[in-house]
């Protein structure tokens, strides 16, 4: 997978290219990350990259010419078939479904805004899609871009030890992840669930599925509304809800 970055702070992306799973993917040429800094496309001695917005108001916008030239340079290197993404609070909110869609692209250019954003005409003419990582404002698009890269890179063949790791992760099936345990068997009086040490793979699978369903129902119930549950999942969820109400009833009686 090839990813081009448009950023005033390309050094920030060393966190992606030099460390962890993504850093290893870059070293193995499974993931290619190239950066373009709009400052390198300025024509004045001060390397100016911001400009005043029409209509006044606080803050500045990224200057059109250096940003557009940087995008064009990235597009020229990428060639045909590249999708240009602008990281923006106004964009579609990134979730696992979106990650899967973006991971299907062989080439992406990620435009990281700064200041108060970029000229709307650039969004209309240069940007294919806008994406957001949440309903809050950051100082720039670099951290959202790194989040997106980390998420989509997991679906590139060979990046993870097992492709199943990406497919079984939290949200991969629309559910929250189940609890995980490692040694020691007993930690401060808390014991690893016996089923996980039973060696019975089918029972372990069912336990994990039930835990995922219960966590999702308790913490993010809106996610379940989007899913077409299997018969097995429906039955497990019914059991979970019934058991929960029984516990609540006993608690009320004791109170």
UniProtKB/Swiss-Prot annotation:
Enzyme class: transferase
Annotated localization: Cytoplasm
Residues that coordinate or bind S-adenosyl-L-methionine: 113, 133-138
GO CC annotation: cytosol
Family statement: Belongs to the RNA methyltransferase TrmD family.
Matching HAMAP family: TrmD
Annotated protein name in UniProt: tRNA (guanine-N(1)-)-methyltransferase
Gene: trmD
């Amino acid at each position: 997978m090839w990813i081009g970055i448009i950023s005033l702070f390309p050094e920030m992306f060393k966190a992606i290219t030099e460390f962890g799973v993504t850093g290893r993917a870059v070293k193995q040429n499974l993931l290619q990350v190239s950066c373009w800094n709009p400052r390198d496309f300025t024509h004045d001695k001060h390397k100016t990259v911001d400009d005043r917005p029409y209509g006044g108001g606080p803050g500045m916008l990224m200057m059109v010419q250096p940003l557009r030239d940087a995008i064009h340079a990235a597009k020229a290197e990428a060639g045909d078939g590249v999708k240009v993404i602008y990281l923006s609070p106004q964009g579609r909110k990134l979730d696992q479904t979106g990650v899967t869609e973006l991971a299907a692209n062989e080439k992406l250019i990620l435009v990281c805004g700064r200041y108060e954003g970029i000229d709307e005409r650039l969004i209309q003419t240069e940007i294919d899609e806008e994406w957001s990582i949440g309903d809050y404002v950051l100082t720039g698009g670099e951290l959202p871009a790194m989040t997106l890269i980390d998420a989509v890179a997991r679906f590139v063949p060979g990046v993870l030890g097992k492709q199943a790791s990406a497919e079984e992760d939290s949200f991969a099936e629309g559910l929250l992840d189940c609890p995980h345990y490692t040694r020691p068997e007993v930690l401060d009086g808390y014991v690893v669930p016996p089923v996980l040490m039973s060696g019975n793979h089918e029972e372990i699978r069912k336990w994990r599925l039930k835990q995922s369903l219960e966590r999702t129902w308790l913490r993010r119930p809106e996610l379940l509304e989007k899913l077409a549950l299997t018969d097995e999942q429906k039955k497990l969820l019914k059991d979970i809800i019934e058991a929960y109400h029984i516990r609540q009833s006993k608690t009320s009686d004791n109170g």
